Each structure stands twice: as C-alpha cells, then as structure tokens.
Amino acid sequence: QGLFTSDQDLYTDSR
C-alpha cells in the first residue's frame, strides 16, 4: 500500500 500515515509513519513506505 504505502498510504497509511495515520497509524504510523513507518507504514507509509514500509508496505
């Protein structure tokens, strides 16, 4: 994905 910056900033470009 790479569009979930609401939960954690690490899931923004980790997925």
Swiss-Prot record:
| Key words, A-Z | Calcium, Heme, Hydrogen peroxide, Iron, Metal-binding, Oxidoreductase, Peroxidase
On cofactor binding, the record's note says: Binds 2 calcium ions per subunit. Binds 1 heme b (iron(II)-protoporphyrin IX) group per subunit.
Q: What class of enzyme is it?
A: oxidoreductase
Q: Name one GO molecular function term.
A: lactoperoxidase activity
One GO process term, biological-process aspect: hydrogen peroxide catabolic process
> EC number(s) in its UniProt entry?
1.11.1.7
The record lists the catalysed reaction(s) as: 2 a phenolic donor + H2O2 = 2 a phenolic radical donor + 2 H2O
List cofactor names only. Ca(2+); heme b
What is the protein's known function? Removal of H(2)O(2), oxidation of toxic reductants, biosynthesis and degradation of lignin, suberization, auxin catabolism, response to environmental stresses such as wounding, pathogen attack and oxidative stress. These functions might be dependent on each isozyme/isoform in each plant tissue.
The family this protein is said to belong to:
Belongs to the peroxidase family. Classical plant (class III) peroxidase subfamily.
Q: What is this protein called?
A: Peroxidase 10
Natural source organism: Daucus carota (Wild carrot)
